Design a protein with these regions (language model features):
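Alpha/beta enzyme core
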Residues: 2-7, 11, 19, 28-38, ...
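Acidic, Ser/Thr/Pro-rich intrinsically disordered transcriptional activation regions
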Residues: 14, 21-22
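Residues that form generic nucleotide/phosphate-binding pockets
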Residues: 25
Length: 241
């Protein structure tokens, strides 16, 4: 074979592709059920399985139905679950106080899941919008601004309540500046040093969130989220976030 006088043979990467066994041996990425995260939408009550029209195949589930669904997924090898609450309007207020209430059905469901499936990995959602009467991820001022600093202690209190309920991972999805440090400090000070933070580091002000907000009935009552979520036109900004 002509090698153009080079002291080495040309690369022949096809050697590692010539049969299924070799391809399997050299495969870098393998996807297994235990690597998947199953998002589940929960509501208060019993016997509820409410289909979500904008998310075909998904339903809002009450505690009993959700536990049954987790058992079905568990038997398929799925071990990681992320819970999202749909909160009734009468429980919402401007400071999202229901998010850390002892009567919060979301926290109760988390405790039930961990009691029945103690080896599962359970992930939460930390943001004000499911609990806020304004439908925003932060405190809304009288002139319509999102108050970043007033929001941070609320997120921290929410995160601690979720850790106490048994969540293994806290998932801040609010896009407030500085929230990770504040949440980490609050978790550590409350004895939850082992609770992880799995944050939404790059969340865009995108129409693609429409079906999700419909699932949780958490769309903003006024304005939009463009002052705290990222501009979809900016790619490199995600690295800074």
């Amino acid at each position: 074979m002509e090698t153009l006088g080079l002291p080495f043979q040309p690369s022949r990467p096809r050697r590692n592709r010539r049969n299924a066994a070799i391809r399997g041996l050299t495969r870098e990425t393998r996807l297994h059920p235990e690597q998947l995260i199953y998002p589940l939408f929960c509501v208060d009550g019993a016997g509820i399985e409410d289909p979500i029209g904008t998310l075909p195949g998904m339903s809002r589930l009450s505690e009993d139905k959700l536990l049954d669904e987790i058992e079905r997924a568990w038997n398929l090898g799925i071990r990681n679950f992320c819970l999202f609450p749909m909160v009734q309007d009468h429980l919402k207020d401007k400071t999202a106080s229901y998010s850390w209430s002892e009567d919060n059905f979301y926290l109760r469901i988390a405790r039930s899941v961990k009691a029945r499936f103690p080896e599962c990995s359970l992930m939460s959602d930390v943001a004000m919008d499911p609990y806020s009467s304004d439908g925003h991820d932060g405190v809304v001022t009288e002139d319509g601004r999102i108050d970043n600093e007033a929001t941070l202690p609320i997120l921290a209190r929410m995160a601690v309540a979720q850790a106490q309920a048994g969540f293994d991972w806290i998932g801040p999805s609010d896009m407030m500046d500085g929230r990770i440090g504040v949440i980490r400090e609050a978790l550590d000070e409350s004895g939850h040093q082992d609770t992880g933070i799995l944050a939404y580091t790059a969340k865009y002000a995108s129409a693609f969130y429409g079906p999700f907000r419909d699932a949780l009935d958490s769309a903003p009552k006024s304005g939009d989220k463009k002052t705290y979520q990222m501009d979809p036109a900016n790619v490199t900004e995600a690295l800074r976030e």
